[in-house]
Amino acid sequence: MRLLTIVFSNHCDLDCTYCCVQSKNLSPVNADFKQIKEFIDQYIEDEACIEFYGGEPTLHKDLVKEILDYIDSLDIDVYTRLYTNGMFKDWTDEEIVSVSNRISETLISLDGFTFEESKQRFETEDEFNQVMKNIKTVLTTSTFLGISTVLYGRAKFENMFNNYKLFRSIGVNYFSYEPLTIYNDNKPVVIPKEFFKEFLIQINRIYQDSIENYPDDTYLFVAKELLSSKWFNQGELTQCSKMVRAISPRGNVYMCRDHAANEEELFYSPKVIQFLNKNNFKNDNESFPIIEQNENNLTSCPVKNIQYRDSKMEGSLYWLEDEVQELYIEPLYRAIQALDNKRKDAYNDMLTYSKTVTKYLMKEDANEIFKVSIN
């Protein structure tokens, strides 16, 4: 499935402290429908996924509707996904319902079930309450609604299972998690071992509850920063240069939505960013030669691979050794894939292993966990 991302602008009505978009609200232009239409025409194929991304795409309500109208006019099977902070500024409930019914999947970013847990996202409790109200509105529609949580700080990890249960109680059945990175060239903070241990405990508890209580009605996603290509490499299916295209507000095409969203900072900012300039991540006649040379090497993200290479990282990532991948990460992703694909024949074995891993994690020190095997 080809992934096509439309970045409307880098403007947003929130200011999350951990946002991956730099130079926010500095887009000199907004996305242009003519350029977006040409982008879709060039790259669309049957069963492609078209993402609405930002910034905050719901700030561009009329353009969202115009693009949906154009997609509907195409005689092709397309999956659509909206990434949003859930504010839906200046949208009526009727507009939220109308557009949600036309979108395949809606992924709302939210850190927890309470305002206290989400203070890095919202200035006021009224903003948080508005998002919770909008979630309940979207749940009345046909769109596949997910909650996307960025995990940082001890409480976020410790509350994963409880928040999962609370969101389930209002009808949410799709949960996406993004742990902080394992290596500090990607983001400002490295996930500590004890937090990583807590993440593994909590995600396994969520998996176990899903299998035991909602096997036909739960979908999980964990950001692939933790993957090792030694086992995840699926050839072109996991190669961004082959499968991914993203159009920026300026109309430039990249193979990574983060590049399209951060275009002003990466390619037009007065300051020189040596890493990006020397590796040339822009489209070159439908080719991304630097990316292609570094795909499926060490991790599933070629940009991270280049960062690791430039940092003289070889063979392992920080403390996430091959043994850790084999004991915790690979089984976790295979279990999630089985759950999402409803491969019920695999449930029992994976559930047993998950419970064994959880018991082990809960009784051992974090430093020990990441250097010894489960007997």
Regions found by a protein language model. Name each.
Residues 258-375:
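Flexible mid-to-C-terminal extensions adjoining Fe-S/redox cofactors in radical SAM and related proteins
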Residues 57-58, 255:
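Class I S-adenosyl-L-methionine
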